[in-house]
């Protein structure tokens, strides 16, 4: 593909508020070849002009696992999955609080509580609304919750309890959605994000790349999410879990994953772009390059899949001279 856009100039125009990236320019990034490293340099320049070498650390707690009535093809917790995972109800409040303390001591700024299922029960919401203030009172942590298709009343209760952010990913382009899940729709996810916004709670929403989406579909999805004005954008790359419909699915290359992140850096220049699940698998020797492009990442494990040892993560970030909250790991 011939080189058409001067991306350093585009980055300067974005920083000055004069323009934003177009659909065509985003597609040019994904299709780039001989000019690719110039584009990467421009994306890195854009990131550094906004947030320098700072990176925020998130820790994820799987607080309720398995037992889900949804049929998401990527998920080991869905009703269709035969993956060998532990299944349990909502963890006791003292266990959640203890894990929040560990997250803080290990340097996290954000504690992410994840619950499987379509949406929480009344009792589960009550439990969350008890433990959230306890965490906020004890620790300087932001709390993000992922708990399915929360209704307006549940969101209001969580807002009153002090929740900082709700995660609800769009996951995959609308045209690809029926290939991934049929127990709910892409519109259901968009409607949930609208309800979160209406309660004046910050939105965390992103993608799972590598589930059969086209380049054009992924860019359309990114621009659709931009309209919904998320606070943070977690970008996952499919962890193909044995026992799920997508358990043997993998067509992404490390360079394609890096191009996706560079494209998203341009689409979301002033938002918190987060490197999430799959980074250890998909980027191979490019992991340092992608880490330099983002504003935050996860320490340790994901939901049912193990990540990297937290000490190793911290050492990796320090070798890159990225500024994170430096606390003694326990």
Swiss-Prot record:
Cofactor binding, per record: Binds 1 [4Fe-4S] cluster. The cluster is coordinated with 3 cysteines and an exchangeable S-adenosyl-L-methionine.
Keywords: 2Fe-2S, 4Fe-4S, Biotin biosynthesis, Iron, Iron-sulfur, Metal-binding, S-adenosyl-L-methionine, Transferase
Example GO BP: biotin biosynthetic process
Family matches, as PANTHER family: BIOTIN SYNTHASE, BIOTIN SYNTHASE, MITOCHONDRIAL
Name recorded for this polypeptide: Biotin synthase
GO molecular function, one term: 2 iron, 2 sulfur cluster binding
Database matches in InterPro entries: Aldolase_TIM (IPR013785), BATS_dom (IPR010722), Biotin_synth/BioAB (IPR002684), Biotin_synthase (IPR024177), Elp3/MiaA/NifB-like_rSAM (IPR006638), rSAM (IPR007197)
Subunit details: Homodimer.
Functional note: Catalyzes the conversion of dethiobiotin (DTB) to biotin by the insertion of a sulfur atom into dethiobiotin via a radical-based mechanism.
Protein family (similarity comment): Belongs to the radical SAM superfamily. Biotin synthase family.
Catalyzed reaction equations: (4R,5S)-dethiobiotin + (sulfur carrier)-SH + 2 reduced [2Fe-2S]-[ferredoxin] + 2 S-adenosyl-L-methionine = (sulfur carrier)-H + biotin + 2 5'-deoxyadenosine + 2 L-methionine + 2 oxidized [2Fe-2S]-[ferredoxin]
Pfam families registered for this protein in UniProt: BATS, Radical_SAM
Recorded metabolic or biological pathway in which this protein acts: Cofactor biosynthesis; biotin biosynthesis; biotin from 7,8-diaminononanoate: step 2/2
Lineage start: Bacteria, Bacillati, Bacillota, Bacilli, Lactobacillales
